[in-house]
Amino acid sequence: MQQRQLGSQGLTVSALGLGCMGMSFGYGQNDERQSLNTLARAFELGINFLDTAEVYGPYTNEALVAKAIKGRSDIKVATKFGFRISEQGEGRARMTGANSDPAHIRRAVEGSLQRLGVETIELLYQHRPDPAVPVEDVVGTMADLVREGKVKYLGLSEVSSATLRRAQAVHPISALQSEYSLWSRDPEWDILATCRELNIGFVPYSPLGRGFLTGKFPAADTLAADDFRRTLPRFQLDAQAHNQRLVDR
């Protein structure tokens, strides 16, 4: 497996990473044993870069990843904070808005460390921008966690080039994560160029279009009732039929 360096601070990961969200959140129910077998096979193939978040579950995805990496020191896990999580409801219904308040960041990191069973988080992302908290305050808190040894490298997700520049001025950012695939190409407008300029790694999520570009995607109305893709315009029946014709070319 080829390796890639993300940013300028020393983070090196496998060229292919594995996003774990769908194993316990967002895409309907999944079998834990099957998910663990998938992770074990990924490790055999040389993948050492996993992506999770506290909000996936919530919390259960990090616990799943912890089972997969237990006893290993070669796997690099990225996790995220940035949402207010209600004690009420199930799944995505528990996400009640952005929260990157410094105190919340610290609570989230302590929780992630405990659930993942690690002493240090390899890569910590802000999951989404919080309009109520300046990015300088967010990254300042994250940088404090680096100095305290609780986090190694910092990342952001779905921010603009201007925000990325402001963040980089506070502390080196190792990775920027955004959706990027053949049918979601917004990063080509400017964010990829900004990442190159600032020497920040770019980590695409959903590179297979949330499964659609595999060529094996079922009709959206056959997805599980709690599969959030049912709510996305691109998967509505008319749009999906049009998009499928493009994939089939």
Spans of features found by a protein language model:
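Conserved, mostly hydrophobic/aromatic
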Residues: 6, 18, 35, 42, ...
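Active-site gating/metal-coordination segments in enzymes
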Residues: 87-123, 179, 183
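N-terminal binding-site loop/beta-alpha segment at the start of enzyme catalytic domains
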Residues: 1-76
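Structural motif
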Residues: 41, 45, 115-116, 149, ...
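Active-site mouth loops of central-metabolism enzymes
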Residues: 21-33, 91-106, 127-132
